[in-house]
From Swiss-Prot:
Pathway: Lipid metabolism; sphingolipid metabolism
Species of the source: Homo sapiens
Region named Homeobox-like: 67-128
Descriptive protein name: Ceramide synthase 4
Residue list for modification Phosphoserine: S342, S349, S350
């Protein structure tokens, strides 16, 4: 059963152009070609990268965040309340006012006290700035290293400057060790991101991030197996060119260097728009869609590969819209607003001031008159103006 599926899955017509077989890509006479089994090393490499990340965040990222002045906010802990906790975990984190009134009556609390409990309970689950800084600093280190390493690998290759050369003698293109190790490192890193996704800081575009990481892993796996390494390497380099800038923006933002953060974000926005909305469609998509089949007809891998690239481009457009909204706010107000993907800390003063304008529910169920808004409520600094990848690809 398994052998039959394996034989069907690796049919030449799925992976290779017409009239090309796997036999032509066997190593011979010192010529080495990519083989799908080479990628089995990516999983243990991902585990090694995870261990390196944990060590980096613990022994480098955390001390660095404190040295640079990144401080966690002091959060007021909620008083244990079984009824409210059960509703929070099973029914939702943001109950409507009728639900709040009912819960307040059940617990013998005022409406304002119940609102405050849910607000502080939500804040309790939000990640602290030092955790965000550690994650951003690890990704910054990897993306910058990967971009510099990839540029050094591809700088002297003809297809970096003329993407049409990706199809020169395709698929009979030999594998260079430097390109193999760079590709394997990228695949291992994205696998480690997928493994860590449930435990990392979650953004409002969490689903888009999951899709992006899965598409990236499938693209790298397919492109390596089908010897589409040349065009695949251009896709990787194009994404790495802006990702490290985004992570740098986050780090500076957590350090509260507003002017530096604004300047970096403008640079990142320009690089992101140019690489994802200009170079990617005009150089990558054009050559894979038109020039790749100039000498050979289309095949399943052609449609599959281009379909994944188009899905990646849709994610680029989605994140570009988020960036444009932030840029519009920047142009309007003169400083960068919080990242609209971020989960923002809620302050006690904001909702208490609003609640003071409406009657409050008392313990006995009677409505009380409006109370003056508190003037000494703690004001939490808005955290997380900028986030991760991608706003990426990735």
């Amino acid at each position: 059963m398994l052998s039959s599926f394996n034989e069907w899955f690796w049919q030449d017509r799925f992976w290779l152009p017409p009239n090309v077989t796997w036999t032509e890509l066997e190593d011979r006479d010192g010529r080495v070609y990519p083989h799908p089994q080479d990628l089995l090393a990516a999983l243990p490499l991902a585990l090694v990268l995870l261990a390196m990340r944990l060590a980096f965040e613990r022994f480098i990222g955390l001390p660095l965040s404190r040295w640079l002045g990144v401080r966690d906010q002091t959060r007021r802990q909620v008083k244990p309340n079984a009824t409210l906790e059960k509703h929070f975990l099973t029914e939702g984190h943001r109950p409507k006012e009728p639900q709040l009134s009912l819960l307040a009556a059940q617990c013998g609390l005022t409406l304002q006290q119940t609102q405050r409990w849910f607000r502080r309970r939500r804040n309790q689950d939000r990640p602290q700035l030092t955790k965000k800084f550690c994650e951003a600093s690890w990704r910054f280190l990897f993306y910058l290293s990967s971009f510099v390493g990839g540029l050094s690998v591809l700088y002297h290759e003809s297809w970096l400057w003329a993407p049409v050369m990706c199809w020169d003698r395709y698929p009979n293109q030999t594998l260079k060790p430097s390109l193999y190790w760079w590709y394997l490192l990228e695949l291992g890193f994205y696998l480690s991101l997928l493994i860590r996704l449930p435990f990392d800081v979650k953004r409002k575009d969490f689903k888009e991030q999951v899709i992006h990481h899965f598409v990236a892993v499938i693209l790298m796996t397919f492109s390596y197996s089908a010897n589409l390494l040349r065009i695949g390497s251009l896709v990787l380099l194009l994404h790495d060119s802006s990702d490290y800038l985004l992570e740098a923006c986050k780090m500076v933002n957590y350090m509260q260097y507003q002017q530096v953060c604004d300047a970096l974000f403008l640079i990142f926005s320009f690089v992101f728009f140019y690489t994802r909305l200009v170079l990617f469609p005009t150089q990558i998509l054009y050559t894979t869609y038109y020039e790749s089949i100039s000498n050979r007809g289309p095949f399943f891998g052609y449609y599959f590969f281009n379909g994944l690239l188009m899905l990646l481009q849709l994610l680029h457009v989605f994140w570009s819209c988020l960036i444009l909204r932030m840029l519009y706010s920047f142009m309007k107000k003169g400083q960068m607003e919080k990242d609209i993907r971020s989960d923002v800390e809620e302050s006690d003063s904001s909702e208490e001031a609003a609640a003071a304008q409406e009657p409050l529910q008392l313990k006995n169920g009677a409505a009380g008159g409006p109370r003056p808004a508190p003037t000494d409520g703690p004001r939490s600094r808005v955290a997380g103006r900028l986030t991760n990848r991608h706003t990426t690809a990735t």
